[in-house]
């Protein structure tokens, strides 16, 4: 049996599926509409507030929790993630299932989205059986990457130290925090490149599979660096 097996932590949006193909636009519009209705703001003012909280706190809901405690969290998450419409715009990443099958160790989804959204998207992509666990923000304390406690809570749920984890994410900020906690880091996406806290930069799932084969060599790997 392998000693200290690796645990792979995967972001969801723009890592396991292409959220920029329309899903983020849909979610942002739904969030803006909800904020406008509940706080009695114009659409423009609600959009500005949504973006301000996202930039300031890492998630719109985090800002709402701080400044508008009267907001019903479950209602906000439900209204801002219209699942039926989201699934009509879902575009998975090529070679995902094949790559997941080649990764040694446990695998989990670690997303800032709500758990019902994580499960619905994973099911629709046919990926649920490839993972040992699926985590949305309400599973680890309504926290959000890059809050360090979010990572530690997920590690606790998996009963694994951060040092045994590999974080795969399209966000450099999220990976910077993962590295600070001792995780290996894989920056996923066409815009990824070499940075001091990045162990590997990959543009697609095929390159991730290649990196996984070199994991024991403890070296930086950047497939898409100019």
Annotate each predicted stretch with a short phrase.
Residues 1-6, 101, 114-226:
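Asp-based, Mg2+/Mn2+-dependent phosphohydrolase catalytic module
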Residues 2-94, 116:
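N-terminal helical cap/lid subdomain that shapes the substrate entry/recognition surface
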Residues 14, 109-112, 169:
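Conserved residues at beta->alpha junctions
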